[in-house]
Amino acid sequence: MWQSSCKQALHLLFLDLVGSDPDVMAERHMTFPTDEEKIRELRAGDSVTVDGHIIGIRDRTQIRIFDQGIEPPMDLNGAFLLHTAPGVRKLGPGRYEKVSIGTTTSARMVRFTEPLGRDYGVRAICGKGGLPDEAIEPMRRHGMVYFAIVGGAAALETEQIEEIEEVAWEELMPECLWKFRVKDFGPLTVAIDAHGNSLYHDVQEQARKRLEDLYAGL
């Protein structure tokens, strides 16, 4: 019961921070991997909970793929990518259990948005702090979304991850490729949708307009 209340509070908190009206936003439940059609049904501000599989990825993983030209050993088509370097406990060769799995800052990885969608068919990215405007057009063009999650909620996120099913490139620990099985992961807020809408951009524009109004009143 408390988990459900906590999830809803986190989503409403995020919508309040970005100035969106929760009464006009849809609540959705999705399973990943998924396809472009389902992604394009989402709109900025929607609340989404996720079942299925998500892929943990971070800076060094993507540098290996795109800068060094090494193909990833996991299928990323239709994938949900989580920006993370999780805290785990090793149980044996290739076997790990979760300790703490939170998110890391997404903005420094924005340059990978275009090739993730174009070359690998990635459908969703989730992390902390959002993505800048340069991610909006690649996400619109390739049918992708960015899911926002409230920072500092790693304990709840870890609980929603049922199992670490697979790990690749262990030499990059903890920035390996991770495959997590999740249940009711979220709520996540669609912060950038596949139609060119971004809650982050909207907030920046609101702040700019208010600043202009303040200066005009001096």
Give a label for each model feature.
Residues 163-218:
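C-terminal binding/interaction regions
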Residues 26-34:
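Short, structured beta-strand/loop micro-motifs enriched in basic residues and often containing a Trp
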Residues 36-41:
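Short, surface-exposed secondary-structure edge patches
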Residues 47, 53-57, 194:
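Short, charged beta-turn/beta-strand-edge "cap" motif at the junction between a beta-strand
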Residues 56-185:
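Feature captures the catalytic cores and cofactor-binding loops of soluble hydro-lyases/lyases
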